[in-house]
Swiss-Prot record:
InterPro entries: Ribosomal_uL22, Ribosomal_uL22_bac/chlpt-type, Ribosomal_uL22_bac/org-type, Ribosomal_uL22_CS, Ribosomal_uL22_sf. This is Large ribosomal subunit protein uL22c. Part of the 50S ribosomal subunit. GO terms for molecular function: rRNA binding; structural constituent of ribosome. HAMAP family: Ribosomal_uL22_B. One of its GO terms (cellular component) is chloroplast. It comes from the Eukaryota. Signal peptide: none annotated. PROSITE patterns: RIBOSOMAL_L22 (PS00464).
Length: 125
């Protein structure tokens, strides 16, 4: 978690080795980038993909951390950055006919989410 001055507060949270392909997760996180916390949660709850569940847990956890540790309201937060990186493959073998094996690669990925406080500037005339 990174703490700056009042207008630059941000919460950075990440999770590693989610058993899902990065391609499928990117399809979900591209929809919430730049939205406020409330809009992001609503989008994730109504999308029909399995990849929404870990992203929803992570966004909710980041907002709770910002509320508890830095005293920020959830309504003041927006999704500044979302990054999904490919992780390593879990390698398995599937038995095939005539004593052969077939390799199976189960992909993993890492998610990084940065929530920032909305800054409102008043223009002086």
């Amino acid at each position: 978690m990174k703490i700056g001055n009042d207008s630059n507060k941000e919460v950075k949270i990440f999770v590693k080795n989610i058993h899902m392909s990065a391609y499928k997760l990117r399809r979900v996180v591209n929809q919430i980038r730049g939205h406020s916390y409330g809009e992001a949660v609503m989008i994730l709850e109504f999308m029909p993909y399995r990849a929404c569940y870990p992203v929803l847990k992570l966004v909710s956890n980041a907002a709770e951390n910002a509320n508890h540790k830095m005293g920020l309201r959830k309504a003041d937060l927006f999704v500044s950055e979302v990054k999904v990186d490919a992780g390593s493959f879990a390698k398995r073998l599937r038995l095939r006919a005539q004593g052969r094996n077939y390799p199976i690669h189960k992909p993993t990925c890492h998610i990084t989410i940065i929530l920032k406080k909305k800054s409102v500037y008043k223009e002086e005339l």
